[in-house]
Design a protein with these regions (language model features):
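Structural motif
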Residues: 1, 65-66, 104, 249-255
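N-terminal Rossmann-like NAD(P) cofactor-binding module of classical short-chain dehydrogenase/reductase
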Residues: 61, 65-68, 86, 106
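Glycine-rich, N-terminal phosphate-binding loop of Rossmann-like dinucleotide-binding domains
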Residues: 70-71, 109
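Short alpha-helical oligomerization interface
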Residues: 76-89
Length: 285
């Protein structure tokens, strides 16, 4: 049995759907989120639990061979914080899985995760990677770079909806291996019960590294209209949720070119071109 934690989110939901399509027996951790209803109808078994409640996690992992977690506090509210979920909550889940002798623990981290990072989210991801490596379980760390669907939709889609210029940081010329969520799902599915994925960190990027300015230019080609751009300095205000400003600034402070040939060869996955994602996100009107 496979336990998916974070199934109510985009990535976790897609992974759950993929596992069910493969005929896998899937249990999903839920707090009664309506977003899980379709997955339950499709065959996933719900179990009530919370990353902040160790006792509930002990029940959730009973009889489980593989844990896959995509959960984070980025879109949570109430008493959920990066510390309570991404640090303490993940440690609770690791402890419960280790105590239950889970055979493989698949953790969704981030390409830029680093325990020494000044950014709390990236630091907690990095610290969780370290804890998982010490756990004694076979582990797989998925470290995807920036999701096209999420960030293109937020940065470009918001501007289109509001009839405003696209706002970019700096000169928008630093290159990044933006990746489609579906490609991360493919790697996750290929990693389950796969010794080639055991005890390793898998960086996941897209088929090419492009700058934000290039992204806007190519999206404009896809939708068949010009897109004007406003550039603001690092630290300037952005028309996207303030919690995401830090990552947007960071994309103009370093480049991230993720080599993918070895991942493609090892796991048999293909990578989705930028234009294909843009066509889904921004259909011509």
């Amino acid at each position: 049995m496979i336990l998916v934690v974070g199934a109510s989110g985009l990535l976790g939901g897609m992974i759950t759907q993929g596992l069910l399509a493969q005929g896998k027996v899937v249990r999903i951790l839920t707090r009664g989120n309506p977003a899980c209803a379709a997955l339950i109808k499709a065959g996933a078994t719900p179990v009530e639990g919370d990353l902040k409640d160790p006792a509930s996690l002990a029940r959730a992992v009973k009889g489980v061979t593989t844990v896959i977690t995509t959960a984070n506090a980025a879109q949570r509210s109430g008493g959920d914080t990066f510390e309570s979920v991404d640090l303490v909550g993940n440690q609770n889940l690791i402890d419960a899985a280790a105590a239950a002798s889970v055979k493989q623990f698949i953790f969704t981290s981030a390409f830029a995760a680093d325990a020494r990072s000044p950014d709390a989210f990236m630091s907690y991801k990095g610290r969780t990677e370290q804890a998982l490596a010490r756990s004694g379980m076979n582990y797989t760390i998925l470290a995807p770079h920036v999701f096209m669907e999420v960030w293109f939709g937020m940065v470009i889609g918001t501007a289109l909806q509001q009839g405003e210029p696209v706002t970019l940081v700096g000169r928008g010329d630093h290159r990044h291996s933006f990746v489609s969520v579906g490609d991360v799902v493919s790697v996750a599915l290929a990693a389950v019960d796969n010794p080639a994925a055991f005890n390793r960190r898998i960086a996941i990027g897209g088929p090419e590294a492009v700058s934000w300015t290039e992204v806007v230019r190519r999206v404009a080609q896809v939708i068949g209209r010009d897109l004007s751009v406003t550039y603001v300095p690092i630290g300037g205000p952005l028309p996207i949720p303030p919690a995401t400003w830090g990552l947007m600034y960071a994309t103009e402070m370093f480049e991230a070119v993720v080599p993918m040939d070895a991942v493609i060869d090892t796991f048999g996955v293909s990578l989705t071109p930028l234009e294909e994602v843009a066509k889904r996100l921004f259909p011509r009107t």
